[in-house]
A protein has these predicted regions:
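Polybasic/polar functional segments that serve as interface/processing modules
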Residues: 1-115
Length: 115
């Protein structure tokens, strides 16, 4: 999991991103397209066109890091491109990385009795 401090903001770059990009070009996209500082310690999340891959970049004060996750089944839930840049919580990011709909997480059924 991504080592984050409490109070770290998580930003989704809505729409799709070319997943061939590395951390430097994603940081440039944060600066130019989103109008934010990629070195401020916030997490920036990008999704590819096929929706099964996300990349996350963040600067921890020492250097830039890149995290990538591909789902074996399903797709990452993503806001529509008209929404611009969207801030979510760290818990919502954890749901997203587990393949759960972060907008409306549902409890899973757990039986109380066996048999």
């Amino acid at each position: 999991m991504i080592p984050t401090r409490s109070g770290v903001r998580v930003w989704l770059a809505v729409g799709h991103t070319d997943m061939r990009r590395g951390m430097n070009s994603l940081a440039l996209q944060v600066q130019q397209a989103l109008g934010r500082d990629p070195h401020c310690g916030d997490l920036y999340v990008f999704r590819g066109r096929r929706a099964d891959l996300v990349k996350i970049i963040w600067h921890d004060g020492v250097g830039m890091s890149l995290y990538m996750k591909r789902l074996e089944r399903g797709r990452f839930i993503w806001p529509s491109p008209a929404d611009g840049c969207l801030q979510i919580s760290g818990a919502q990011l954890a749901y997203m990385l587990d393949g759960i709909d972060w907008r409306n997480p549902l409890r899973t059924y757990r039986p109380e009795l066996a048999g």
